[in-house]
Structures are given as structure tokens and as C-alpha cells.
Amino acid sequence: MGFTYKDSGVDIDAADLSVQMIKRYARQTHIDGVLGDIGNFGAFFQLDGSLRQPVLVSGADGVGTKLKVAFMMDKHDTVGIDCVAMCVNDILVHGARPLFFLDYIAVGKLIPEKISQIVKGIAEGCTQAGCALIGGETAQMPDMYKEEEYDLAGFAVGVVEREKLLDGSKIKQRDAVIGLASSGLHSNGFSLVRKVLLGKMKVDEYISDLKKTLGEELLTPTKIYVRTVLDVLNDKIHGMAHITGGGLLENLPRILPEGLEFRIDKNSWEVPVIFKIIQRLGKIDSKEMYRTFNMGIGFVMVVERDEVENLLRKLNELGQNAWVIGDIVPGEKGVII
């Protein structure tokens, strides 16, 4: 008997079983507008007819080397939340409400139970963001990845009325900068984290300062800000930023008009313990920390000064810790910390 596709490392039966598992989780995320089910060649979504000038906003991202920690712990049910968060928080910056999400999973060996755990996390992330998981791709690539490893990326599409689209152009001098607390490291800087921490500690080591194991801290899912931010969004909010790779120093200038810069007071919030541990053990310069990690601020809103008290009150009522962390001053499209 000749070779089969399975002999080369690609198991179609396992793929079929995975699709059936994925359908169950995907259906749990369905919202108005979803047409059809997982398994078609394309996925369908019908826009709300009440939108006057809808603008679609899209974003794509991955989880990066945070996945290495998931491999080490053999825990795969939270990285999907990270994947959704990285995408929906990006499009949220522009005032967009996420509508639907698609995932891409590339594996060395397809194990349906592992895929099921990954997609369970993706579905949970979609539920938190109020969007639907409507499709994706699971690619078996036996010579590209080790059998126990995979890569994970996603694609989010949202909608905003054209007149409500935020791009930072309304930001002006004396606007206040509100920082929303992160849940931890989120999904950035893990190559440095692994170099600094995992050479000295084990993922199952209990860290008294963290009150949990190192692995539990590192795998804490990225916070999804969608429902909170959409609840408080109004015309006095002039710009927003998702603090991802590059930290405050690299992400904040992306939304600034010419002739302005951010002035950030790093003493206005308490930097979480995990960042202090990384900085101490790695002997990392403060500037490097602020251009690599979120340092406890996962999302930023730039608002009119007379809106600060009202916005902070609303965020607090929604259970979101937030602080005034700076203001907008004349400058060269940079960040002063």
C-alpha cells in the first residue's frame, strides 16, 4: 500500500473532529448579523441596516512568545483570550465595536483536544468583547513546528459611524490622559521575560510577592477593554491608544497630531509587582522597561479636562481601575515620562 497524507503528518480525520469541536464554541458567540455556520468556504456577517455611514475597522495580531509559557505549562485555554484581546483592543482605539473574529492556528501535530482548549479561550474572548467567532483556519504543518507547539493569530472586524471615528486628530493641548489598568504583562515583551525570568525560576515556582506561581502570573489573560470603553465613550474623548509592544513610549505617539506630546507622571499609578521583579532581576533600564512593557497601563484615553471626573467615576462604577496619568503639552510628537 502506498503512502497516505497521514503518513506525512497530516491527519484529516483529526481535522474533521476538531471542526466539530470548534463549531460548538463558535455557536456560543453568535450575535445578530451572523449568517451561516463554521465550515463554509467563507464566513458571512450582515451589517445593521440602521447604520448611516458605517466604517469597517479591521485588525490582525498574534500572541507571540507568550505561547512558549503555555507549552511549558501544558495549559492552552487562556491564550485564545489573549489573541482576541490583542485584535479587538486595537480596533477599539478607533471607536469601533467589534463584530466578528477569525482565528488562525498552525500546529506541528493536530491534537483535537488541544485545539478545543485553544478555541474555548478564543470563544471566551469573543464573548467578553461582544463579537462572534465566525471562521478560521487550522493548518497542519508537521515540518514547520514541533509536535507539541503551535502558533496562534487572529483577525477582528468592527464598525463605527464615520462621524464617530477616532484617529487622534482632535487631541489638543491641555487634554488630560487617563490610564486604564492592565491585568499584567498582557501579550508583549515575553521574549525578554523568558530570558530574564525563566533562566532563574520555574513556571510552577510559587512567588510570594505575586501570591501565585510564576506561570499563573505569566499566563494571566490580556484584559479586553471593549465593553467598558464603549460604555463610557463620548464626544469629549479625543483619542485612545492600546498599550502593546513598544509600551507607552512607542504607542502613545501614534495618535498624536503634529506639535504635541504626552507628558506622563510615572508616579500617578502603582506599577504591578511583576514588572518590578523583571526590572530587578534583569537589571533593566527604566526607559527600556517603558518601551517594552505596558507597566500596568493597558489602555489610554485622552479627554477634555472637564470630563476627567465624570469619566473616572464611570470607569470606577464599571470596575475598571483608572488614573489621570498625564496631559498633552506642546512638543515633537513624543512622550516625556
From Swiss-Prot:
Q: Can you cite an annotated GO cellular component?
A: cytosol
Q: In which pathway does it act?
A: Purine metabolism; IMP biosynthesis via de novo pathway; 5-amino-1-(5-phospho-D-ribosyl)imidazole from N(2)-formyl-N(1)-(5-phospho-D-ribosyl)glycinamide: step 2/2
Indicate the secretion signal residues. Answer: none
Query: Is Signal there in the keyword field?
Result: no
Single GO MF annotation: ATP binding
Q: Which superkingdom? A: Bacteria
Which leading EC class covers this enzyme?
A: ligase
Database matches in Pfam families: AIRS (PF00586), AIRS_C (PF02769)
Task: Give UniProt keywords alphabetically.
Answer: ATP-binding, Cytoplasm, Ligase, Nucleotide-binding, Purine biosynthesis
Reaction catalysed by this chain? Answer: 2-formamido-N(1)-(5-O-phospho-beta-D-ribosyl)acetamidine + ATP = 5-amino-1-(5-phospho-beta-D-ribosyl)imidazole + ADP + phosphate + H(+)
Q: Where in the cell is it found?
A: Cytoplasm
What's the EC number here? Answer: 6.3.3.1
Annotated GO biological processes are: 'de novo' IMP biosynthetic process; adenine biosynthetic process
NCBIfam families given for it? purM (TIGR00878)
Entries under HAMAP family matching the protein? AIRS (MF_00741)
By sequence similarity, the record places it as follows:
Belongs to the AIR synthase family.
Q: What is this protein called?
A: Phosphoribosylformylglycinamidine cyclo-ligase
Organism (species): Pseudothermotoga lettingae (strain ATCC BAA-301 / DSM 14385 / NBRC 107922 / TMO)
